[in-house]
């Protein structure tokens, strides 16, 4: 009888151990399943963020293409002529509000393209603002982002305005040569938009 009781006790202990092991395995499986769900949730959030980034980039490209249709495309830039006269700072702010900057020619090809575009889109206009100035340090010309200008296309005897004339004009009558001018003068201008690659 004691032997039967011992056998029954061993069977009950074995069943309890088996159930405990089975329960522990199920708990581990649930934890693993929760971790996989959490990981997938993180992956989905990352994918959604990437999609939003792509959607916003496509919106920018579409807006830029609209600008390019109204203006002209040169190399990896689009140019868009202004409607009215503004002083240098207002012109730059207007270009920024449209997603661009005041035009900055970086080589002779861009000078030629600007001259052609300026004649077509700003008929009768002798000069327009460039995104170049020496407001911070006299004689050190930088673009509107503060980067030093390496390509220069000054007209004869220019720059000549000293501290009174810190902003730069593109002169149609001087075949695209530059001159310095008082930044408070009201002039036409051309905005430049970089085409994403």
From Swiss-Prot:
Family annotation (InterPro entries): C-type_lectin-like, C-type_lectin-like/link_sf, C-type_lectin_CS, CLec_Tetranectin-domain, CTDL_fold
Give start-end ranges for the coiled-coil region(s). none
Q: Where is the signal peptide?
A: 1-22
The entry's function note states: Promotes cell adhesion to laminin-332 and fibronectin.
Can you say where in the cell this protein is located? Secreted
Which PANTHER family does the record associate with it?
Answer: C-TYPE LECTIN DOMAIN FAMILY 3 MEMBER A, TETRANECTIN-RELATED
Q: Which organism is it from?
A: Homo sapiens
Share an example GO biological-process annotation for this protein: ossification
Q: What is its main location?
A: secreted
Q: Where is the C-type lectin domain?
A: 74-192
Q: By what name is this protein known?
A: C-type lectin domain family 3 member A
- What tissue specificity is annotated for this entry? Restricted to cartilage and breast. Also expressed in breast cancers.
Alphabetical UniProt keywords: Disulfide bond, Lectin, Secreted, Signal
S-S bonds? 68-78, 95-191, 167-183
According to the UniProt entry, its GO molecular function terms are: carbohydrate binding
The UniProt entry, under PROSITE patterns, shows: C_TYPE_LECTIN_1 (PS00615), C_TYPE_LECTIN_2 (PS50041)
Q: Which GO terms describe its cellular component?
A: extracellular space
């Amino acid at each position: 009888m004691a032997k039967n009781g011992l056998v029954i006790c061993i069977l009950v202990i074995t069943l309890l151990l088996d159930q405990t092991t089975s329960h522990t395995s199920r708990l581990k499986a649930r934890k693993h399943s929760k971790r996989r769900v959490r990981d997938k949730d993180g992956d989905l959030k990352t994918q959604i963020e990437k999609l939003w980034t792509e959607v916003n980039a496509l919106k920018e490209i579409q807006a830029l293409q609209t600008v390019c249709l109204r203006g002209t495309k040169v190399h990896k830039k689009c140019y868009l002529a202004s409607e009215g006269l503004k002083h240098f700072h207002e012109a730059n702010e207007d270009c920024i509000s449209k997603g661009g900057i005041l035009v900055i020619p970086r080589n002779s090809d861009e000078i030629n393209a600007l001259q052609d575009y300026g004649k077509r889109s700003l008929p009768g206009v002798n000069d327009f603002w460039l995104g170049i100035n020496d407001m911070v340090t006299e004689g050190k010309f930088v673009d509107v982002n503060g980067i030093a200008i390496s390509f220069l296309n000054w007209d004869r005897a220019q720059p000549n305005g000293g501290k009174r004339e810190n902003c730069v004009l593109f002169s149609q009558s001087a075949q695209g040569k530059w001159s310095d001018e008082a930044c408070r003068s009201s002039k036409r201008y051309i905005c430049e938009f970089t085409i994403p690659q």
